[in-house]
Amino acid sequence: MAARSLSGAVKSLCSAASGSLSCSIVLRRSYVATSQNVTAAGLSKGGSTRVMVGKMEQRGLDQEAESAWGPDPVTGYYRPSNRAAEIDPAELRELLLKNKAKSF
């Protein structure tokens, strides 16, 4: 209920001070507004955008190599190539029970 009253207060504040603040930014959720402000502040600093673009491209190339997909040899469906082989829970239980029976 406090959130609703806070929202009403923000709306009335926005209508009162519409000359200096954008209502759309004030009415958005706080995490969205702060992330946009950080991005806008980072891009307004002249030469830092080129460095960031280069780093983003390098990350993209690294991620493509890590997330390569390939056909599964058993089913033929595509899956991540760096994924371990799956084992059926029933088969795993059977293997574990056989090993315990032999140790006695």
Curated annotation (Swiss-Prot):
Its main location: mitochondrion. One of its GO terms (cellular component) is mitochondrion. The keyword Transit peptide applies. The keyword Zinc does not apply. Keywords: Mitochondrion, Transit peptide. One of its GO terms (biological process) is response to water deprivation. Residues 1-31 form a transit peptide. It comes from the Eukaryota. Coiled coil: none annotated. Induction: Induced by abscisic acid (ABA). Accumulates in roots and, to a lower extent, in leaves during progressive drought in an ABA-dependent manner. Triggered by cold acclimation. It is found in: Mitochondrion. Pfam families: LEA_3a (PF03242). Belongs to the LEA type 3 family. This is Late embryogenis abundant protein 41. It comes from Arabidopsis thaliana (Mouse-ear cress). The gene is LEA41.
